Amino acid sequence: MKIKYLLLIIISVLITSCSSNQAMKPEDFKNQKPRLIIEEYLSGNVKAWGILQNRSGKVTRQFSADLDGKWDGKQLILDEKFVWNDGEIQNRQWTINKIDEHNYEGTAGDVVGTAKGFSYGPAFKFEYVLLVPVKGREMKITFDDWIFMQDERVAINRAKMTKFGIKVAELTVTVSYTHLTLPTICSV
């Protein structure tokens, strides 16, 4: 009986690991529109609102964020200010370099090593390890961070956070490009 359960567990692990090859890839979006050019979209003032969910899906925190990006033709400097619903304020400054049409690299003070970015069509994927404060200490959390352009003003950001390959949390963010002139929908 124990051997059957062990065999079932081994088969489940093998099936799960094989199915991970079918994971979403940035290249899957190469022929879709609108095209997200991250250095253009994040240049200027951008506003974001999001939720943090624990591994079981329960919303544990909410935030709003102000992003201010400056692109010099080679490098994007992105200042982020997060205001959490519990009053915590977090600041991060990203330095993002465009390597070629589809590849980016980024660094920030609380990012371990170099983040890798990939851009195709309306999708931008950012992979990095972030030092996250948890109960008085810092934990290394791996981010699988996706931004999907919806139109010229709005993008949706989903980030899966893992530790040792196990999902620990997920972020869902709505991003709005605030320095475009919006059409007037009613007049007085």
Predicted regions and their residues:
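N-terminal helix-cap/turn-to-beta initiation motif at the start of protein domains
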Residues: 29-45
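Bacterial N-terminal signal peptides that target proteins for export
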Residues: 1-7
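Conserved small/polar residues in nucleotide/adenosyl-binding loops
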Residues: 178-184
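Central antiparallel beta-sheet cores of small beta-barrel/beta-sandwich binding domains
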Residues: 49, 53-134
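Mature, soluble, non-transmembrane domains
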Residues: 107-164, 170-174
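C-terminal motif of bacterial Sec signal peptides marking the signal peptidase cleavage site
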Residues: 16-17
